[in-house]
Amino acid sequence: MVRRTKEEAQETRAQIIEAAERAFYKRGVARTTLADIAELAGVTRGAIYWHFNNKAELVQALLDSLHETHDHLARASESEDEVDPLGCMRKLLLQVFNELVLDARTRRINEILHHKCEFTDDMCEIRQQRQSAVLDCHKGITLALANAVRRGQLPGELDAERAAVAMFAYVDGLIRRWLLLPDSVDLLGDVEKWVDTGLDMLRLSPALRK
């Protein structure tokens, strides 16, 4: 009985997340209410509050779902024991771009995060959440780059902090550009070239050296 109740709770949580995704994609995060999500999910607002305190937590759940399929590659590149951290980063980026193009749900969630998540005054929690997510990502990239330097895969004088900012900006900008104008960039056909462009920047740019 306890197991069944737990499974039902997990199913309800998944329903709510799916409904939030649909509502956010259609109306934007700021214009969507928890009542809208409850109606789409076929649950009460109380059921939503059982699982999520606010919209910020629902946005975080969508963000977390993007990381599930490639989290192991991120962790590997950040580990000092990984012998090929730059290779792990390359695989991760290939996976990120391929999923963006080929998986409809991944594309919708990215649309929400990049183009439908307005930072209005009453959305300060979501702004803070996104700031925290960017800083966490920066920390992970910096660790991966430092590991690649130690393994001789990147120049010894690479400024890992500055390079991490540049790499995030490159990837984030390419995703935003493709979402806005998908026909202007062959992200799938040229995926290896796009990834290697970013990695070549790390290897070759004098401006990223200390």
UniProtKB/Swiss-Prot annotation:
UniProt xrefs under SUPFAM superfamilies: Homeodomain-like, Tetracyclin repressor-like, C-terminal domain
HTH tetR-type domain span: 10-70
Alphabetized UniProt keyword annotations: DNA-binding, Repressor, Transcription, Transcription regulation
PROSITE patterns noted in UniProt: HTH_TETR_1, HTH_TETR_2
This protein's GO CC annotations: protein-DNA complex
Residues in the signal sequence: none
Top-level taxon of origin: Bacteria
Gene Ontology MF term list: DNA-binding transcription repressor activity; transcription cis-regulatory region binding
Matching InterPro entries: DNA-bd_HTH_TetR-type_CS (IPR023772), Homeodomain-like_sf (IPR009057), HTH-type_TetR-like_transc_reg (IPR050109), HTH_TetR (IPR001647), Tet_transcr_reg_TetR-rel_C_sf (IPR036271), Tscrpt_reg_MAATS_C (IPR013572)
Keyword field contains DNA damage: no
Pfam families (UniProt xref): TetR_C_2, TetR_N
Keyword DNA-binding: yes
Start-end of DNA-binding region: 33-52
Induction: Induced 4- to 8-fold in the presence of toluene; this is controlled by TtgX, a possible efflux pump global regulator. Induced by chloramphenicol and probably by tetracycline.
Subunit note: Homodimer.
UniProt xrefs under PANTHER family: HTH-TYPE TRANSCRIPTIONAL REGULATOR ACRR, HTH-TYPE TRANSCRIPTIONAL REGULATOR RUTR
Function: Represses expression from the ttgABC operon promoter and its own expression. Binds to a promoter region between the divergently transcribed ttgR and ttgABC genes/operons; in the presence of chloramphenicol or tetracycline this binding no longer occurs and ttgR and ttgABC are derepressed. This suggests that TtgR binds these antibiotics.
Protein name in the entry: HTH-type transcriptional regulator TtgR
Gene it is expressed from: ttgR
